[in-house]
Swiss-Prot record:
Disulfide bond entries: C94-C170
Organism per entry: Mus musculus (Mouse)
Keywords: Cell membrane, Disulfide bond, G-protein coupled receptor, Glycoprotein, Membrane, Receptor, Transducer, Transmembrane, Transmembrane helix
UniProt GO molecular function: G protein-coupled receptor activity
Record's bilayer topology term: Multi-pass membrane protein
Any Pfam family matching the protein: 7tm_1
Superkingdom per UniProt: Eukaryota
GO annotation, cellular component aspect: plasma membrane
Transmembrane segments: 28-48, 57-77, 92-112, 138-158, 183-203, 234-254, 278-298
Name of encoding gene: P2ry10
Function noted in UniProt: Putative receptor for purines coupled to G-proteins.
Family: Belongs to the G-protein coupled receptor 1 family.
Glycosylation sites: N4, N14
Protein's name according to its UniProt entry: Putative P2Y purinoceptor 10
The organism's taxonomic lineage, starting at the top: Eukaryota, Metazoa, Chordata, Craniata, Vertebrata
Compartment(s): Cell membrane
Length: 328
């Protein structure tokens, strides 16, 4: 395949141009930006300042929020491009924003998997949870950032084909670098296995194990409410994973084969290309769903939000009363 984004399969099936994708991306990112920025900023503030460091998965939640904010902060540039269809900035900024999209996706996948796995293991082996150190989670998080950050580098590199420093194209309009088919297929298989199949199997197993544990008698100091909390947490992780990341990774296999003209059937080519923008938009929705995850997962998180909301309301009422008394 050449350095443009059009394969022979796309040309033969007259599916080289998808005008609806610009308005779809712009609308989705506008919908996500303000709520996502406010929710994740508030979540990060509460998680860092008020949640007990003994709370299970707190480190993973903080890192998940950071990953979401990294993507959210790049959304205004994406919105500008999809509305104007013109990129007036440097090539490096385009590729950085493109990179942050996939960094957010795969960092979120691994941190959700860690939250689910840790909650399940601590439920089944509560004595291990008591001896677990916070620095272990910090170390695991650092490894995830290094591995995911390195593994996501091919995304902007492979889309850097023919992109001059003064180009006005970015994001969905970026070209593809020519690659050997064997190398590309190998990369896709590794990405699908490590970035989707293994995490989804892990989360599914955690959900099943946690559900089964409810049928067994509680262990020592562990009550039924603790088990229900764990199940709720694991279910929320699974829900975010299925809604946001499963559609993209299922379609990604077909999308790659269409781009390499391995798939040439026009109905399949068109449906794959048409669904691709929707799957990417669903992946970005994790920035809105993750703060809901924190709310339902940590009772301290809910308490702190309630207390902060009450204090803000009281301060506003007091300022109004003082203002009215001065007038009177």
């Amino acid at each position: 395949m050449g350095s443009n984004s059009t394969s022979s399969a796309e040309s033969n099936c007259n599916a080289t141009y998808l005008p609806f994708q610009y308005s779809l991306y712009a609308t989705t990112y506008i919908f996500i930006f303000i709520p996502g920025l406010l929710a994740n900023s508030a979540a990060l503030w509460v998680l860092c300042r008020f949640i007990s460091k003994k709370n299970k998965a707190i480190i993973f939640m903080i890192n998940l929020s950071v990953a979401d904010l990294a993507h959210i902060l790049s959304l205004p540039l994406r919105i500008y491009y999809y509305i104007n269809r013109h990129w007036p900035f440097q090539r490096a900024l385009c590729l950085l924003c493109f990179y942050l999209k996939y960094l957010n996706m795969y960092a979120s996948i691994f941190f959700l998997t860690c939250i689910s796995l840790q909650r399940c293991l601590f439920l089944l082996k509560p004595f291990r949870a008591r001896n677990w150190k916070r620095r272990y989670d910090v170390g695991i998080s650092a490894v995830i950032w290094i591995v995911v950050g390195t593994a996501c580098l091919p995304f902007p590199i492979l889309r850097n084909a023919g992109l001059a420093n003064s180009t006005d194209s970015c994001f969905a309009d970026l070209g593809y670098k020519q690659m050997d088919a064997v190398v590309l297929v190998t990369m896709v298989v590794i990405a699908e296995l490590a970035g989707f199949v293994i995490p989804v199997i892990t989360i599914a197993c955690c959900t099943w194990k946690t559900t089964v544990s409810l049928k067994h008698p509680p262990i020592a100091f562990q009550g039924i409410s603790e088990r229900k909390k764990a199940l709720r947490m694991v279910f929320m992780c699974a829900a975010v994973f299925v809604i946001c990341f499963t559609p993209y990774h299922i379609n990604f296999i077909f999308y790659t084969m269409v781009k390499e003209s391995i798939i040439t059937s026009c109905p399949t080519v068109k449906s794959t290309l048409y669904f691709h923008p929707f799957s990417l938009c669903l992946a970005s929705l994790c920035c809105l769903l993750d703060p809901i995850l924190y709310y339902f997962m940590a009772s301290e998180f809910r308490d702190q939000l309630s207390r902060h909301g009450s204090s803000v309301t009281r301060s506003r009422l007091m300022s109004r009363e003082s203002g009215s008394s001065m007038v009177n």
